[in-house]
Amino acid sequence: MIILGIESSCDETSIAVVKDGKEILSNNISSQIEIHKEYGGVVPEIASRQHIKNIATVLEESLEEAKITLDDVDYIAVTYAPGLIGALLVGVSFAKGLSYAKNIPIIPVHHIKGHMYANFLEHDVELPCISLVVSGGHTNIIYIDENHNFINIGETLDDAVGESCDKVARVLGLGYPGGPVIDKMYYKGDRDFLKITKPKVSRFDFSFSGIKTAIINFDNNMKMKNQEYKKEDLAASFLGTVVDILCDKTLNAAVEKNVKTIMLAGGVAANSLLRSQLTEKAAEKGIKVIYPSMKLCTDNAAMIAEAAYYKLKNAKNEKDCFAGLDLNGVASLMVSDEKAI
């Protein structure tokens, strides 16, 4: 089975070819990070225009690397939700054009499910499990049962963790994206430099706006007093607090649901402190932590193709998986609100 995956939900244009749910024949990505750097974040209109400019070229590169043609493709998987609506529409429209021209069925994929299924490309995942999804736009704890039903049991009430990293990095003058820089700075700083109060929110939900505000207020106060501090110390205090919260809530969810596996997913799953600390704390409770390789943490089309593979595999009737040419992009859609796959 050959699935062509298409991903364009934010600022990466990606097309991949995945065979039989395990073999990545190609996974090409055209990133826009350098373009958006000067703005300190993703500009939706620019992102959409870049997708239009790049998507045909990325397709050609992916097909060439996979050594196939469109005639060899059995299914087209495309991200349709959630994301920047203009960016989503580029990928969805491109998928519909290919489907119409070559009579290939379209399988719509939820972007967050794609991130979680990235783990299935590299691991034998034991279900049920808990997944911590952490990215620039999302922070969720999701329970996945034996039948691949996705149940959202926790979410951020304000900023996503990746968004908070970018905002703190902007205050510290570290550039965009902020996550990788803060990750490196953590090991050079003192995580106990600034005591940050952890927000009290219900059960498995998160709140990061107060932590971000504490960093901003401290920086402003120091500037008003003409006092200096080590940026590494403030970055370490911020990241240490955030990772503590992520680990504690995720582990509590895993214990309550009595699962033996935790999956990390999303761009922030590449964070070295989060990986090591969650793995260490989970091991104390007899729980295994798995996460994708670095190349599969960020937005990519291989994970979208993989999600489509399991959508087909678990469907009673494969035609229930298909979308027509009236498929549209959806900017906001909780993973629990989509039909189970």
UniProtKB/Swiss-Prot annotation:
Q: Which reaction does it catalyse?
A: L-threonylcarbamoyladenylate + adenosine(37) in tRNA = N(6)-L-threonylcarbamoyladenosine(37) in tRNA + AMP + H(+)
The family annotation for this protein states: Belongs to the KAE1 / TsaD family.
Free-text function comment from the UniProt entry = Required for the formation of a threonylcarbamoyl group on adenosine at position 37 (t(6)A37) in tRNAs that read codons beginning with adenine. Is involved in the transfer of the threonylcarbamoyl moiety of threonylcarbamoyl-AMP (TC-AMP) to the N6 group of A37, together with TsaE and TsaB. TsaD likely plays a direct catalytic role in this reaction.
The EC number of this protein is 2.3.1.234
* Entry superkingdom: Bacteria
* GO MF assignments: iron ion binding; N(6)-L-threonylcarbamoyladenine synthase activity
Its needed co-factors are: Fe(2+)
**GO terms classed as biological process:** tRNA threonylcarbamoyladenosine modification
What is the protein name given in its UniProt record?
Answer: tRNA N6-adenosine threonylcarbamoyltransferase
Q: Which gene encodes it?
A: tsaD
The listed locations are:
Cytoplasm
Q: Report the NCBIfam families cross-referenced here.
A: gcp_kae1, T6A_TsaD_YgjD
Q: How is the cofactor bound?
A: Binds 1 Fe(2+) ion per subunit.
Q: Which organism is it from?
A: Fusobacterium nucleatum subsp. nucleatum (strain ATCC 25586 / DSM 15643 / BCRC 10681 / CIP 101130 / JCM 8532 / KCTC 2640 / LMG 13131 / VPI 4355)
- Assigned GO CC terms: cytoplasm
Q: Which residues bind substrate?
A: 133-137, 166, 179, 183, 271
Please name the taxonomic classification of the source: Bacteria, Fusobacteriati, Fusobacteriota, Fusobacteriia, Fusobacteriales
Q: Which residues bind Fe cation?
A: 111, 115, 299
Keywords for the protein's UniProt record, in alphabetical order: Acyltransferase, Cytoplasm, Iron, Metal-binding, Transferase, tRNA processing
